[in-house]
Amino acid sequence: MIEKIINQYQKKLFLIAYSGGIDSTVLLYKMLKIKEKNPQIKIRAIHINHNLHPSSKKWEEHCIKICHKYKIPIITKEIKILLKKNIEETLRIKRYNTIYNYLLNDEILLTGHHLNDQCETLFLSLKRGSGPTGLSGMSIENFLGKKRIVRPFLTKTKKELQKWACENNLESIEDFSNFNIDYDRNFIRHKLIPILEQRWPFFLKNCFRTTVICREETKLKNIFLKEKIQNLINFDESLNIQNFKNINKEVCKALIRYWISLKNIKMPSYKTIECIYNEIICSKKDSNPKIIIDKNEIRRYKTSLYFIKIQKDISNIFLFWHNTDKKLLLPEDLGYLIKNDKGFILPSPKKNELINIRFQLEGKILILGREKRRKIKKIWQEHNIPPWLRNKIPLLFYNNRFISAIGLFVIKEKIINKEKEIQKNWKISWINNVHFNRKNFFLFY
């Protein structure tokens, strides 16, 4: 089985996640057997020391010894965590991030996950109340970023691997923390699955079938959603929800979930998706609701839904631009201002006026091309600027005299010049990562 899986890959570079336990040990020896028949195959191993057990260093030394014995290059890395909650999940994420950093572009990561692991994962997903996507469990092949992970033992039981290890007298280690039933996975492994297997010997195989069915259903659903959502994603990657009130609630929630999945973050819970629908999609047009997901916000503006990274408040920041021959860096990755011939045309400052940039403005103003003063809030709305971006636009001041929102508008002033000289202009460009929408004449990150 494993040989058939390995031989289907043209690139013959493999990195084995090697803990020293029986599963990864069988994987290591199986790969050595395959390499004997296919010398072009190149194998490396990586061992992650979690530093959770007094014997952690001995296990690391064991892995090094075995790899040296069979002339397999090995990488060893230590990871530490400070959190005491969600230890299993935190370690898993940190372990994969570490492995990813050492995985070569053309290299395939091999792990020793087996059918029992798949069943445990299924039960953990059931405990969390997961839907079909979560119940899909692990797949034999998937991608970590752009790099491939393969689990060649996923259809094999733990007993089958133990039998092979015993028949071939393999040296492996036993992590006794795997027997600590305070951990959810261990509780399922030692207290739940043995009883189910005793009652129904075919139970593990049927668990695998369930994950396959859920994966197929998820894939089919995503094909439908991908086709449908292409017409709903705007130029700035926001989601057009104008017609959501005319669409079935379940379809709306599925579209929201799929849209969020494109952001490469951990998928929010069912409850969170429900909140997004009820509190944002179904809210009044003039409301400004938001849902926080980790370090991001889901917000609505007019007929679109936005996924925004939470940023620091810079509304009280003042920047003085003393030397306009040099560019002025703006905070929070907002780019920079530069004087050039391609920029926004502005009246030049008077002598002794200090050029400064701010990010907050209140009250009424009169802009060039208008006859009446209007509240700044109304002007932002006219320019289609959502509330969370209004304190991100550089505002040009000469001393305390407001001149312009760079790239948007200029203040209308009555210029009294006793010497009747023509007022000079200069040009400023705001170089940034903002997308300009000429049709709706503004910008979203």
UniProtKB/Swiss-Prot annotation:
CDD domains: TilS_N (cd01992)
InterPro entries the record matches: Lysidine-tRNA-synth_C, Rossmann-like_a/b/a_fold, TilS/TtcA_N, tRNA_Ile_lys_synt, tRNA_Ile_lys_synt_N, tRNA_Ile_lys_synt_subst-bd
GO cellular component, one term: cytoplasm
Cellular compartments annotated: Cytoplasm
Reactions catalysed, as given in the entry: cytidine(34) in tRNA(Ile2) + L-lysine + ATP = lysidine(34) in tRNA(Ile2) + AMP + diphosphate + H(+)
Gene Ontology terms for molecular function: ATP binding; tRNA(Ile)-lysidine synthase activity
Assigned EC number: 6.3.4.19
Top EC category: ligase
A Gene Ontology BP annotation from the UniProt entry: tRNA modification
Main location class: cytoplasm
Keyword Cell cycle: no
Domain of life: Bacteria
Keywords from the UniProt entry: ATP-binding, Cytoplasm, Ligase, Nucleotide-binding, tRNA processing
Domains (record comment): The N-terminal region contains the highly conserved SGGXDS motif, predicted to be a P-loop motif involved in ATP binding.
HAMAP family to which the protein is assigned, alphabetical: tRNA_Ile_lys_synt
Family annotation (NCBIfam families): lysidine_TilS_C, lysidine_TilS_N
Protein family (similarity comment): Belongs to the tRNA(Ile)-lysidine synthase family.
Protein name: tRNA(Ile)-lysidine synthase
Species whose genome carries this gene: Buchnera aphidicola subsp. Schizaphis graminum (strain Sg)
Gene: tilS
